């Protein structure tokens, strides 16, 4: 039975390996209910408590200096907020193993429940795309191209902009389950915050500037 509440989720990190000391430095989640985007999102920059390798910063554009200029909190300061936001939801993630691994590692550092213990259901859009389009490219960029989704504002791989794109991709991939247009028409306008371009349907619950 499909869950009423879904969260489109993405993270940015210092590297690839949560079990080898890499840390999360950005979290974003966009809420949907019954396949309709709501006004709610959670977007946080996070201090990783370690260096940010140049090769990682080249991907997401976040350096330690930038994070410190945003007064980014440590994960220990926001982990409970993230857990409460995700609890009981279906999580829509592209390459879910990566983000789930980092979130669970960060939660475990704090003694918090894992995503599974929070009763979250995981849906991996990468696996969905590989099944639906076998032998074809299945990256988020490739899927945006396939579904003619505008990604011109995506300069870096930011967690929030990637969530916004993934929301459109997911609704397009699963269009037979509900109306793609209705998901966007069902929400009103809200003002965008200053640090990241975003569609008007988002009201950020918490974001450190």
Language-model segments: residues:
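Conserved non-catalytic scaffold segment of RNase H-like nuclease domains
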Residues: 1-119, 130-133, 142-156
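Acidic, Mg2+-coordinating catalytic module of metal-dependent nucleases/exonucleases
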Residues: 90-96, 102, 106-107, 139-199
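Short, flexible loop segments at boundaries between secondary-structure elements
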Residues: 123-131, 188-195
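Metal-dependent nuclease catalytic regions and adjoining charged, substrate-binding loops involved
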Residues: 199-205
């Amino acid at each position: 039975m499909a869950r009423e509440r879904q969260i489109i989720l993405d993270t940015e990190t210092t590297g690839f390996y949560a079990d080898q000391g890499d840390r999360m430095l950005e979290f974003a989640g966009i809420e949907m209910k019954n396949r309709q985007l709501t006004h709610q999102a959670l977007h946080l920059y996070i201090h990783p408590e370690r260096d940010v390798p140049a090769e990682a910063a080249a991907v997401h554009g976040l350096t330690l200096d930038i994070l410190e200029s945003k007064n980014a909190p440590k994960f220990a300061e926001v982990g409970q907020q993230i857990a409460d936001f995700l609890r009981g939801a279906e999580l829509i993630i592209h390459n879910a193993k990566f983000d789930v691994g980092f979130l669970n590692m960060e939660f475990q550092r704090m003694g918090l429940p894992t995503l599974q213990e929070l009763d979250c259901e995981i849906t991996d859009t990468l696996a969905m795309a590989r099944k639906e389009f076998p032998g074809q490219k299945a990256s988020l960029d490739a899927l945006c191209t396939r579904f003619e989704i505008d990604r011109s504002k995506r300069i870096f791989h930011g967690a929030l902009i990637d969530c916004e794109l993934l929301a459109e991709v997911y609704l397009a991939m699963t269009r037979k389950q509900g109306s793609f247009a209705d998901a966007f028409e069902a929400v009103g306008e809200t003002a965008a915050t200053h640090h990241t371009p975003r569609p008007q349907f988002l009201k950020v619950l918490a974001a450190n500037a």
